[in-house]
Amino acid sequence: DITTMKPNLLKNMYATIAALFVAMFALPTTMHAQTEYDLTICGTKVTSANCNDLSKIDGVSGTVKYNPGNKLLTLQGATISSNTTNAILSYIDGLMIKVIGTNNLSTAGNTTLSFRKPLTIMGGGVLNAKSQSDCAIYANGTNLTIDNCTVNAESGAYGIAGNNGSNEKFTIRNATVTAIGTGNGSICDFA
């Protein structure tokens, strides 16, 4: 009989809609984990979530972005400044820092640009690295190449330094480099 079929049909439709809402909102969803890279800017880890616009990090302005595919950190008219930690800390093997325009890195009591794997600064622009009381640029047991750009490093301690001079290499190609380390050395501790 049609009069009892209609309420059953509506009842079944309401039950189906309720089940869909439960499935959509109550069941756990899959979260996509972000990838962390061995690169820190002003104490903040660079990840797949923030790598396209690192200027959102406190202490960072201008264009700063990291491309993990070719290990390229691009600085364009950037300022990266911290009073509590390194401006840039890298453990990436083969990191290239491309400088476009004039870029300024500064720290108070920490190394400004510190890295433990080979690093190249390139790109035709200018990089000014300044630390009040630690290394402006620190090749910690690894190699530094400055290629086709201008780098000015200044510190009350070390300008551009290796760790102990046993195996670190410092290469300058078609570049202008100025280093001032008033306390301990302007360029020192390279093999």
Feature map (PLM): residue ranges:
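C-terminal segment of classical bacterial N-terminal signal peptides
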Residues: 22-32
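Bacterial N-terminal signal peptides that target proteins for export
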Residues: 3-18, 29
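A composition-driven surface/loop motif
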Residues: 32-191
